[in-house]
């Protein structure tokens, strides 16, 4: 129990499972950092070579593309820290700080994965010249979803911290539930956006999408990961609706089956798929398609810009 007599856990956290997931997320985070660095450097050289033959194209800077994966990396290490502090709690369930850290970190880490998914999808649609196929204006698409993601993150973080005290546990639970429902709402809208994007693209393909098919596999990977986060968030929302004495909160296996495992599968999909389908590859294919379109006389929109960042900035003026 905590100092005020409030019982932090309804069970004693399993040490073995906590260690396993701590190691899995730590190794995954390090592995992805290495992959990201390798493919960023490789893509920069490749794009530089392509641009020599036709420099006036629509493109992203390498740092901007790599930046879409940064929240994902933070998510891996935040998840790692969360499970590491569950190891601490397994030895003494009355310690308050480990409880707060593991609660908050395990709650908010999926919002970091979500931020990367939003940004990768937005960049992919822009490189495909298919912004008009999204359900909201391209300039605001990623921003709106990320704002919702940040709002969800803050509510869950604040609520998770408040749950450590008996006097604020109920209010904290309500905040976490609200944050989870915001996440569910935005993610539900985003999944609809992804699915509609696939159907619209099949009926109205762009010059990039008809020349290369990598974007389809990247979008499928993003869609699968989106469903993993959605399922996890729904279960966690039910947990907090049931309350402290509910079925889910009273049994640790729910945390691993419906939170730890789905989030590790998400991370695994990112890592395994990355060498084959990533935003750097879409970027290179977009440049090649633009060059081919210009050389063979195909009509191609918005090519006469030096970068996507400058193009979008000019449109907002």
UniProtKB/Swiss-Prot annotation:
Involved in 7-aminocholesterol resistance. Keywords: Membrane, Transmembrane, Transmembrane helix. Its main location: membrane. Coiled coil: none annotated. PANTHER family: PROTEIN RTA1-RELATED. This is Protein RTA1. The chain crosses the membrane at residues 17-37, 65-85, 100-120, 143-163, 179-199, 215-235, 260-280. Belongs to the lipid-translocating exporter (LTE) (TC 9.A.26.1) family. Residues 1-16, 86-99, 164-178, 236-259 are extracellular. It is found in: Membrane. Pfam families: RTA1.
